[in-house]
């Protein structure tokens, strides 16, 4: 079923040829129908690309930053949240997309307390391990 999600999207824009754009309510992403019709995204990456959004926030009055995701809950999979400082935020955004792809491809094998590869010089690395923790989202919308 998961593999057919993006195929369903492509079928919809073909069934409605006058469609101008598609808005993904769960993630807040908007794509033109033309972008969906003409994409070259590999099948296994389409759901993450089209239906999942990774957001970045500066925490006001601090040096802290936040990266989180929206959209995985569409398939009853967990979204991610990173609370950090003194790290390049684009590295964290890329890390989030990599972890989201892993969760999607493997039907969420990560449990609270499990270690995952961290980031060294912008790349995922086993030199630094991060511990996963399931908790409620700090930024709206409410999700677990």
Predicted regions and their residues:
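Aromatic/basic-lined ligand-recognition segments
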Residues: 27-144
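Structural alpha-beta junctions
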Residues: 8-23, 101-111
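Short, well-structured alpha-helical interface segments that form or flank functional binding sites
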Residues: 4
């Amino acid at each position: 079923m998961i593999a057919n999600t993006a195929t369903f999207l492509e079928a919809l824009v073909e069934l409605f040829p006058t469609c101008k754009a598609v808005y993904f309510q769960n993630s807040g992403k908007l794509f033109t129908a033309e972008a969906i019709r003409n994409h070259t995204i590999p099948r296994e990456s389409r759901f993450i690309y089209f239906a999942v959004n990774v957001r970045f926030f500066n925490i006001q009055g601090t040096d802290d930053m936040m990266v989180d995701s929206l959209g995985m809950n569409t398939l009853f999979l967990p979204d991610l949240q990173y609370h950090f400082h003194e790290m390049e935020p684009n590295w964290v955004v890329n890390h989030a997309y990599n972890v989201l792809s892993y969760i999607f491809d493997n039907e969420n094998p990560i449990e609270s307390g499990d270690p995952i590869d961290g980031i060294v010089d912008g790349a995922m690395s086993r030199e630094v391990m991060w511990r996963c923790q399931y908790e409620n989202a700090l930024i709206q919308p409410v999700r677990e």
